[in-house]
Amino acid sequence: MSHPSMIRGALAWSLLGFGLNAAAQTPALFKDADLKLGEKLIAQHKCNQCHAQKWTDDGKAIYRPKGRVNTPALLQGMVERCSTQLNLSLFPEEVTAMAAVLNRDHYRFTQ
């Protein structure tokens, strides 16, 4: 029978490995993005609510696997397009932060 501290240690190493693996798979475009800022801006500008009104399936239909957005650069461009259309006046690093969060949570581009 394994000792509880050994199990916790193995779990910690496994989570650490997952975190390193996830960071290694982040596209170069989003490598230095401020994810906390992206989360804050997505909530502040009510992006999820806006998309839920415009798309079926609570706004998640836009994240279909073979949609028009199929690269990190196109994802960043779509966030920039929303910013322009809605006159949000986002700075480039804010657009990148928001796109990085969308990539992490929905698109999962690795390159």
Regions found by a protein language model. Name each.
Residues 23-42, 84-87:
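Electrostatic cytochrome c docking/interface patches
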Residues 35-40, 48-84:
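Gly/Gly-Pro-rich "capping" loops immediately C-terminal to redox-active cysteine motifs
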Residues 5, 66-67, 94:
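Solvent-exposed, flexible loop/coil residues
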Residues 45:
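Cys/His-enriched microdomains
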Residues 88-111:
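C-terminal capping alpha-helices of c-type cytochrome domains
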Residues 32, 69-73, 89-93:
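Soluble non-cytosolic domains of exported or imported proteins
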Residues 1-32, 109-111:
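N-terminal export/targeting leaders of redox proteins
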